[in-house]
């Protein structure tokens, strides 16, 4: 079983890689057979190639990502609240999701689900 410290460190690396636009760093956190459902209710992306494509599209704009609460990590699962800020066509937007990671025995993310909806998307200042 993964320790809370390991899972928290993975979340911190994920946030840092998003901020740096580090596609390889993000993809390296996931198992080869992982799934990403972002947002929840959308078609899950499965496998390294699909996950790479998803994050490559996500990183087309510079992102400012910040954890807003402590990471909750227990029993091979972690959840974390954060904000993602970006500017598109002169308009700043802030999204406030909660992501849920599930880990395999090797410490890799096997499932990522992003929970957010319209009420969690705001015009930035």
From Swiss-Prot:
GO terms for biological process: steroid metabolic process. It holds the Pfam family SnoaL_2. InterPro entries: Ketosteroid_isomerase, NTF2-like_dom_sf, SnoaL-like, Steroid_delta5-4_isomerase. Substrate binds at residue 99. It catalyses: a 3-oxo-Delta(5)-steroid = a 3-oxo-Delta(4)-steroid. The active site is at residues 14, 38. Induction: By steroids. It comes from the Bacteria. Its EC number is 5.3.3.1. Disulfide bonds: none annotated. One of its GO terms (molecular function) is steroid Delta-isomerase activity. Keywords: Isomerase, Lipid metabolism, Steroid metabolism. Homodimer. NCBIfam families: SgcJ/EcaC family oxidoreductase (TIGR02246). This is Steroid Delta-isomerase. The lineage of its organism: Bacteria, Pseudomonadati, Pseudomonadota, Betaproteobacteria, Burkholderiales. The gene is ksi.
